[in-house]
């Protein structure tokens, strides 16, 4: 299962939001991948997430595979929509 999400927080997917995304992803029994354009990375690796350098207004796709896939997608979606609780 996958979902497209728009990055809306002011500074984009920098260190703090990346850490929050990875922390959320690691709570679930699922393989999680995050894509921007043609680049796909491991959603449970902070260094990989930061390499995406997703800026405000850009779209990412979150894909999850495994027993907790649906719950993982919903949790990450809520986090992104909340602007990572930064604003």
Language-model segments: residues:
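C-terminal structural segments of small proteins and small subunits
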Residues: 53-87
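Absolute protein N-terminus
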Residues: 1-3
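Compact, glycine-rich, soluble single-domain proteins
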Residues: 6-57, 86
